[in-house]
Swiss-Prot record:
Its EC number is 4.1.2.13. Its main location: cytoplasm. Belongs to the DeoC/FbaB aldolase family. SMART domains: DeoC (SM01133). This is Fructose-bisphosphate aldolase class 1. Activated by citrate. The keyword Cytoplasm applies. The active site is at K191 (schiff-base intermediate with dihydroxyacetone-p). The lineage of its organism: Archaea, Methanobacteriati, Methanobacteriota, Thermococci, Thermococcales. GO terms for biological process: glycolytic process. It is an enzyme of class 4 (lyase). GO terms for cellular component: cytoplasm. The gene is fba. It comes from Pyrococcus horikoshii (strain ATCC 700860 / DSM 12428 / JCM 9974 / NBRC 100139 / OT-3). Pfam families: DeoC. It comes from the Archaea.
Length: 281
């Protein structure tokens, strides 16, 4: 991919990935996309400064947030932690059919002014509004790449046709398609769904043709060990890590969860041993 030859893009990507080529990134866009009720399990985390301070202290590799949160709490992201600014989003206040489109909240220049190391946008592959999001992503990627900034695509298959043909949006065939479409549309990093098994996720990674694939953390699991096991399978499948929100900020002990995830992602530790070491089980 021509963009990956750009020194600026390569250097900024390294802000997120350690020498092992893997990353653990904290997601902080839920207040907008899901609403503040997502923070009710641990209400103090509704304050972005509080939770970002905790995750940075625990050793997170990168933090993803929307532009407004970057203005409010961006100072909590230390210089050795990658900052990813997501330029598109939507709320759950819309009627369901209208939730298949993410609108642009800000521009590449805004993200750069906020100190972004990478710029992110979502495409709902298979949505009736897919063409609008493709155009948005293309414009963001083209301009960001011209300025030497990597672009992350949240590649989410979603829509009535997906449900009708594949039964669920996590079917590996459609996740694999979305990952390939993300790579072919110019993404430098891909965030997408877990497909349910190491074998199927390996196909998603291969379909992305060398672009790093990170798993979307999804809903909080009741047992922390269950989530650690999934992340371990992602790594075993050749995935490059995870972008995690609720499985961190909805827990009373987010620092322990992050340290356990670091053990699994960066040290290749057994999930159960990692959980025990951090007091999660």
């Amino acid at each position: 991919m021509e963009a990956l030859q750009n020194l600026g893009i390569r250097r900024r990507l390294k802000r997120f990935f350690r020498r092992d080529g893997r990353a653990l990134i904290f997601a902080m866009d839920h207040g907008f996309e899901h609403g503040p009720t997502d923070f009710e399990p641990v209400w103090e985390h509704v304050n972005p400064k509080v939770i970002i301070r905790k995750v940075v202290r625990a050793g997170i590799d990168g933090v993803m947030m929307l532009p407004g949160i970057a203005r409010i709490a961006g100072d909590e992201v230390k210089p050795d932690v990658g900052l990813m600014i997501k330029l598109t989003s939507k709320t759950n206040l819309r009627p369901k059919p209208d939730q298949l489109l993410q609108s642009q909240l800000a521009y590449v220049e805004d993200a750069i002014k906020l100190g972004a190391d990478a710029i992110a946008a979502t495409v709902y592959w298979g949505s009736p509004q897919e063409d609008t999001m493709i155009r948005q992503f293309a414009e963001i990627a083209s301009y960001a790449h011209d300025l030497g900034y990597p672009v992350v695509q949240f590649a989410y298959p979603r829509g009535p046709y997906i449900d009708e043909k594949y039964g669920k949006k996590e079917d590996y065939r459609v996740v694999m398609y979305g990952a390939r479409a993300a790579a072919e549309s110019g993404a430098d990093m891909i965030k997408t769904y877990w497909t349910g098994s190491k074998e199927t996720f390996a196909k998603v990674v291969e379909a992305a043709a060398g672009v790093p694939v990170l798993m979307s953390g999804g809903a909080k699991t009741d047992n922390p060990l269950d989530f650690l096991k999934v992340v371990w399978e992602v790594i075993e499948a050749g995935g490059s890590g995870a972008v995690v929100g609720r499985n961190i900020f909805q827990r009373e002990n987010p620092e322990s969860m992050i340290r356990a995830l670091i053990r699994v992602i960066h040290r290749n530790e057994d999930p159960e041993e990692a959980a025990k070491a951090e007091g999660l089980i």
